[in-house]
Amino acid sequence: MVVKIGSSTVVGADGKVNRAFIGGLADQAAALRKLGWRLVVVSSGAIACGYPVLGFDRKPVGDLPSLQACASAGQCIISSAYDEEFHARDLLTSLVLLTRHDTARRTSYLHARDALLRLVELGVVPVVNENDTVTVDEIKFGDNDTLAALVSCLVSADLCVTLSDIDGLYTANPHEDPTAEFVPVVHKIDAKIIASAGDSSTSVGTGGMITKIRASRILMTAGIQSVICSGEEPDALVRLARGESVGTLFDPPAERLDIAPRKLWIALGDKAHGSVTVDDGAAKALVSHGSSLLAVGIREVDGQFAEGDVLDVCDPRGMVVARGIAEADSDVLELAAGRRQDQIASNRLLADLAEKPAIHRDNLIVFA
């Protein structure tokens, strides 16, 4: 089981670590072990508990060196809290700090996987966070919801649980709409589900419900169940392990249970360097038939990217339906966009795309 803990859950508004919460989490980890479960923790909070001890009265947004300094100081504080509380329950923790750079290359992605699996095998509870001390925008995961999805795929988790200040998904923002209804189970994440997420980011964190939904979509694609629930829910992890219903469950379809590891790396390892928008016919061919993406189906190209870079594939309504590795650079695909097959074949600059796909099906993962 992977559990992701948001900044506002593990760190109070005063910047102090919530030791009572971490102690309760350690109690649950000990109980889970007796039930045969192993736990990996993805914990935010380094910057949130670092800025007060460095003399800032608020998070220094926009000041990258100061944010990195806060992360460095805060990571020591929060790691010590985990170590002390878990050690008191005879559990050993370890610290794993990752950046997008560590997973963008498949070799280092696999090394990260092997290290995490070995730690779990040895009975250790890994505490994972993004290495905010060295990250810049180009190599950031951006939020720990995405990082938790990555870690869940790395260790082939049975369940990923997000403990937050939100008790689950609603049809609208319950703080603004009194008619909002709680959603106990989600079987498919569509545009309606994404629209209902809105924006619920907090003052101490970087995520919101929309980032949690996107992470859950990746997990559903990987065939991994995920849950969003409140960090104040008593014994949530133990109850989930026993099969109880807590929060909102994102339940993947059975046919998604055997995704090739390399395709999961495409979905998670590197960020998208650009995107292509395809017509409805191409989107249907990808989603329903597992086809390669042909250049003739591309309508728009966004961003600058090279052959071999990872791209998002969007349908005409802007929904990301797939991600894959480009067989041509952005200049070539932009030249091909909107052209008929005969026009592509007759253009000497596009001749290769008449013979090969823009993204081959073996290098393409379709999202659930």
Task: Label the model's feature ranges.
Residues 1-368:
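C-terminal catalytic "cap/lid" subdomain
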